[in-house]
């Protein structure tokens, strides 16, 4: 029989890059943390599980298609989700967008009652879907996502506007159409208008709050 005290609820939040996933995730985390305490809820980003590329040259690293499922170490993420469900702590890798590889340090996460898992490719992997208690797809128009991504990558990740636009045209948009948008069919809840949809956030909060009862 499974120990009820060790059950960890996994909530997946997916959608296009810069669709508002992180905003919804952080809003849900912050507001629920204030209700139940940070010892009961945590957030994990799929971005932390980009594959280690320390064995590659910088020239090779920058050619990586970060919007293709093959760029992700989903096997490690799956292992970590299963460990959390078994009541074990995990060490979440950290990724450098400047060096295009994993950092040396990790982030220690203890068992939580609820883990919010967010990322663009989560719903493309059936193994990850099987670990989720329910999933959300943030459905935001691509032109809005592009503007947000340009602002974010230039200001926060040291990218040039030209490089962001080139990546969007070569990989981001094609990979969204090939992998991410089709994965929307697996979501239990679809949230339009991104992270500022307050009604949707309140509905999600009510749903997640049930797991703390």
UniProtKB/Swiss-Prot annotation:
It is found in: Cytoplasm. CDD domains: UMPK (cd02023). It comes from Pectobacterium carotovorum subsp. carotovorum (strain PC1). HAMAP family: Uridine_kinase. ATP binds at residues 15-22. NCBIfam families: PRK05480.1, udk. Its main location: cytoplasm. GO terms for biological process: CTP salvage; UMP salvage. Keywords: ATP-binding, Cytoplasm, Kinase, Nucleotide-binding, Transferase. The keyword Kinase applies. The lineage of its organism: Bacteria, Pseudomonadati, Pseudomonadota, Gammaproteobacteria, Enterobacterales. Pfam families: PRK. Belongs to the uridine kinase family. Its EC number is 2.7.1.48. InterPro entries: P-loop_NTPase, PRK/URK, Uridine_kinase, Uridine_kinase-like. This is Uridine kinase. One of its GO terms (molecular function) is cytidine kinase activity. One of its GO terms (cellular component) is cytoplasm. It catalyses: uridine + ATP = UMP + ADP + H(+); cytidine + ATP = CMP + ADP + H(+).
